């Protein structure tokens, strides 16, 4: 329904604009690229539309924003407790079910609470004394890059840009699943990049076939030392039976084990350093991380410019 409404309002706007549709689409790209604010986009759109066709611009913009907002997860409203004059048994059932529902529900927290204080000025500008809060909310930019917001793009963010790109090359619309797949692909790509950077800096263990890695940051063992505690098996010596409990006693040489383990520990702990641009450059030398040569070359060029 939302896709049909976007296409219907878009076709009506194309007919009303005529040759100015390309100019209108270019203005929308500037708004999506954060070059213009929403107010500037509305002002430029009013210049190429007559007053009797201005409502088509508002309908198209409203349908497009509703389409993008449809990808946002809806918050479940709290269930309304209905009162009834039933017996004590029904009241007990309601009380127990309400307690169980309260256990399942949780209060959503603001994502900005988990952002570092150094980055809060980028996301949420400081309030100005003497200016009402309503005017301050209007001064905030409605569209920002993901690098400025410090959050990964969601499906709605990607869907709006996909629609503009599809209309540019002559496509009618974009399927909703495409935006969700791209959002998941961005998360997987970022996970692979971070994993490659960390594995270049830290030791880690792999599974038998080498497909999975784990225990990242494990210290490298000294080959000249032999830890006899970890090499011994459970059944290497006869079991000692407890005569009182008649159960197997697996506590063997406890004091000696502590001594051996303390002797095999590291004398100096490993120093934790910050991930630098050099670490990113070394990790990106693996061409399997980024398959696209265009994306790889652009990011490597940006890394080199930031390092020099």
From Swiss-Prot:
<dbReference type="GO" id="GO:0003713">
    <property type="term" value="F:transcription coactivator activity"/>
</dbReference>
<comment type="subunit">
    <text>Component of the Spt-Ada-Gcn5 acetyltransferase (SAGA) complex consisting of wda/Taf5L, Saf6, Taf9, Taf10b, Taf12, Ada1, Spt3, Spt7, Spt20, Sf3b3, Sf3b5, Nipped-A/Tra1, a histone acetyltransferase (HAT) module made up of Gcn5, Ada2b (Isoform B), Ada3 and Sgf29, and a deubiquitinase (DUB) module made up of not/nonstop, Sgf11 and e(y)2 tethered to SAGA by Atxn7. Not a component of the Ada2a-containing ATAC complex.</text>
</comment>
<comment type="similarity">
    <text>Belongs to the TADA1 family.</text>
</comment>
<dbReference type="GO" id="GO:0006357">
    <property type="term" value="P:regulation of transcription by RNA polymerase II"/>
</dbReference>
<keyword id="KW-0539">Nucleus</keyword>
<protein>
    <recommendedName>
        <fullName>Transcriptional adapter 1-2</fullName>
    </recommendedName>
</protein>
<dbReference type="Pfam" id="PF12767">
    <property type="entry name" value="SAGA-Tad1"/>
</dbReference>
<dbReference type="GO" id="GO:0000124">
    <property type="term" value="C:SAGA complex"/>
</dbReference>
<comment type="function">
    <text>Component of the transcription regulatory complex SAGA, a multiprotein complex that activates transcription by remodeling chromatin and mediating histone acetylation and deubiquitination. The SAGA complex predominantly acetylates histone H3.</text>
</comment>
<dbReference type="GO" id="GO:0005634">
    <property type="term" value="C:nucleus"/>
</dbReference>
<dbReference type="InterPro" id="IPR024738">
    <property type="entry name" value="Hfi1/Tada1"/>
</dbReference>
<keyword id="KW-0805">Transcription regulation</keyword>
<keyword id="KW-0804">Transcription</keyword>
């Amino acid at each position: 329904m939302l896709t049909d409404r976007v296409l219907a309002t878009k076709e009506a706007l194309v007919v009303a604009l005529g040759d100015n549709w390309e100019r209108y689409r270019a203005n929308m790209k500037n708004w999506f690229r954060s070059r213009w604010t929403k107010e500037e986009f509305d002002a430029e759109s009013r210049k190429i539309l007559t007053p009797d066709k201005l409502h088509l611009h508002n309908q198209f913009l409203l349908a497009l924003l509703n389409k993008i907002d449809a990808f946002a997860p809806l918050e479940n409203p709290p269930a309304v407790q209905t009162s009834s004059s039933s017996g004590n048994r029904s009241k007990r059932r309601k009380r127990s079910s309400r307690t169980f529902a309260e256990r399942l529900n949780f209060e959503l927290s603001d994502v900005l609470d988990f952002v570092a204080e150094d980055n809060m000025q980028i996301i949420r500008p400081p309030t100005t004394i003497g200016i009402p809060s309503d005017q301050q909310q209007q001064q905030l930019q409605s569209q920002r890059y993901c690098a400025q917001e410090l959050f990964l793009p969601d499906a709605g963010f990607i869907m709006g840009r996909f629609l503009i790109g599809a209309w540019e090359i002559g496509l009618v619309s974009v399927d909703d699943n495409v935006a969700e797949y791209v959002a998941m692909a961005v998360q997987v790509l970022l996970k692979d990049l971070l994993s490659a950077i960390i594995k270049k800096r830290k030791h880690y263990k792999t599974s038998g076939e080498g497909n999975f890695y784990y225990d990242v940051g494990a210290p490298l063992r000294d080959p000249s030392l032999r830890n006899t505690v970890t090499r011994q098996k459970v059944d290497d010596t006869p079991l000692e039976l407890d005569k009182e409990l008649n159960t197997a006693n697996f506590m063997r040489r406890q004091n000696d084990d502590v001594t051996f383990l303390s002797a095999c520990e590291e004398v100096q702990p490993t120093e934790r350093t910050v991930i630098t641009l050099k670490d990113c450059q070394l990790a990106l030398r693996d061409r399997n991380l980024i398959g696209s040569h265009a994306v790889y070359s652009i990011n490597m060029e940006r890394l080199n410019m930031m390092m020099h």
